[in-house]
From Swiss-Prot:
SUPFAM superfamilies for this protein: Putative methyltransferase TM0872, insert domain, S-adenosyl-L-methionine-dependent methyltransferases
This protein's name: Ribosomal RNA small subunit methyltransferase H
Compartment(s) of residence: Cytoplasm
Originating organism: Chelativorans sp. (strain BNC1)
Family statement drawn from the similarity comment of this UniProt entry: Belongs to the methyltransferase superfamily. RsmH family.
GO biological-process terms attached to the record: rRNA base methylation
Enzyme class: transferase
Length: 339
């Protein structure tokens, strides 16, 4: 089925191109004798480039399809590539040793977007799923069971959708007649509620799908936990490089690196000399794709790369308040309802 928004099974899959590859390699400085962790293996673009540059790699992905697809690469570069299934927030347990570099490409992969049966994209008719790890609560569970007020928080805070309340109320009314089963079911309702003009730059369902996906996979919480884990794993001089695709992710990374690259705030009850020293050097200038890359890979247009070098000072305290992002706590607060 093809809806008026352009989603449908006949859409042509986009090529799986690693975003900002040259810039990521320049930041990470891969070389023989270095051990780098790729926290989001996906189709293996970063991992292959790191291996070809001489580095050894530990690659992680929570998607079993990505792990299965990476086995030929692991065989090609054995024993220099270790491929493990898991969340990137679990990198400490998986790596088990200190690292020279860490790269994270945050969010859903092109591979997942292009598989209709995974239910990530309103452009491809499929089950309303969105689970990166293919287990746990699905997007359909959330849409069909959560109260309108909770759905509005998900769409508004995580999707940054200004019509969140109207959409949530329409969902609550619509599911009383027929449950939402497919990506098309939801995308068509959103389009009916808020409309779609030819001049709109994005499909009206874009932000609703973003909010649902982030909630189902606890993407912001995963990112925050991964940043804390990364500073504990990196050797002095090691590089953290993070590619983000929307403002919430980028804000979390930006605030983390800002907080960790200056004298860290301590309790007012402690003496001034007890203030912790910077965990990272001043972050490198953020990078976005150029016109040539976005022309070849339109999905790269919203990408941002932020990177910083680890100092020799001890890792800081794991305090989620330093991010100052209310959306970070939505999944934690509503998560019990999804179980």
């Amino acid at each position: 089925m093809t809806g008026s928004g352009g989603y449908g099974a006949g859409a042509v899959p986009a090529p799986h191109l690693p975003v900002l590859l040259a810039e990521v390699l320049e930041a990470l400085e891969p070389a023989r004798g270095k051990l780098i962790l790729d926290g989001t293996f996906g189709a293996g673009g970063y991992t292959r480039a790191l291996l070809e540059a001489g580095a050894d790699v530990i690659a992680i992905d929570q998607d079993p399809d990505a792990i299965a697809g990476g086995k030929p690469l692991a065989q090609e570069f054995a024993p220099r590539l270790r491929l493990e299934r898991g969340r990137f927030s679990e990198m400490e347990e998986i790596a088990g040793e200190m690292l020279d570099g860490i790269v994270l490409d945050v969010g859903v992969s092109s591979m997942q977007l292009d598989q209709a049966e995974r239910g990530f994209s309103f452009r491809r008719e499929g089950p309303l799923d969105m689970r990166m790890g293919q287990e746990g609560t699905s997007a359909a569970d959330v849409v069909n069971k959560f109260k309108a007020g909770d759905l509005a928080r998900i769409f508004g805070l995580l999707g940054e959708e200004r019509h969140a309340g109207r959409i949530a109320r329409a969902i609550e009314k619509g599911r009383a007649e027929k449950p939402f089963r497919t990506t098309g079911d939801l995308a068509e309702l959103v389009e009916r509620v808020i409309g779609h003009r030819p001049t709109d730059k994005i499909h009206p369902a874009t932000r609703v799908f973003q909010g649902l996906r982030i909630f189902v996979n606890d993407e912001l919480g995963e990112l925050a936990r991964a940043l804390f884990a990364a500073e504990r794993l990196l050797k002095p001089g090691g590089i953290l490089a993070v590619v983000t695709f929307h403002s919430l992710e980028d804000r979390i990374v930006k605030r983390f690196l800002q907080a960790r690259s200056g004298p860290q705030a301590q309790s007012r009850h402690l003496p001034e000399k007890a203030a912790a020293q910077p965990v990272f050097e001043k972050p490198m200038k953020p990078v976005s794709p150029g016109e040539a890359e976005t022309a070849e890979n339109p999905r790269a247009r919203s990408a941002h790369l932020r990177a910083a070098r680890r100092t020799a000072h001890p890792a800081g305290v794991q305090d989620f308040k330093l991010f100052g992002v209310p959306a970070l706590f939505v999944t934690e607060q509503l998560g019990e309802k999804a179980r």
